[in-house]
Amino acid sequence: LVGSEMCIRDSYYRRLCDPDPAQHMPAARAWNAYELACSTLRPQVAPAHSRAEDARALSTARLEAHYFVNTLFLEENQLLDRIDCITHLPATVVQGRYDVICPPITAQRLVAAWPKARLMMVDDAGHSALEPGIRAALVGATERFKTMLSPPQK
């Protein structure tokens, strides 16, 4: 990030962490509305404001912003540079074709570096695990691993 981007990110994080609800709640609601818009292929209705929804929105926004101000606690290319630590394990990478948060090229690069990984591209999905196609692919992958890892039937 360049200086001005860090200033925006850091100042937004400060607003989310401000103890005054008049400061942190509008920021948290906006954060979550933006994330909802980016993470799903089809427009979603934002949840109504309630005490429970506000608590969830605030905790989600603070947690995600904390990761961003700490550069996700990763060095540049750390995952791909250390992929050899897990290439002996089987994996399924579920990717939404219209994911603008983690674009498909990132999943393709991961699978190219991980011989035992299988890529499942979901044509009608973005990023969210709550989208029907992503959810079905995740459940299917889990079922395949359950079968693969279960002891043989007697």
How should these model regions be labeled?
Residues 1-8:
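Short, small-residue-biased leader/transition segments that mark boundaries at the very start
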Residues 12-48:
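Accessory cap/linker subdomain of secreted extracellular hydrolases
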Residues 46-57, 83:
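Small-residue-rich helix-loop
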Residues 66-83:
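Active-site nucleophile elbow and catalytic-triad environment of alpha/beta-hydrolase enzymes
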Residues 75, 100-106:
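Conserved alpha/beta-hydrolase "acid-adjacent" motif
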Residues 86-87, 93-95, 99:
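Short beta-strand/loop motif that positions the catalytic acidic residue
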Residues 104-117:
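Active-site-adjacent alpha-helix of alpha/beta-hydrolase-fold enzymes
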Residues 117-154:
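Catalytic active-site module of serine/aspartate enzymes centered on a nucleophile-bearing elbow/loop
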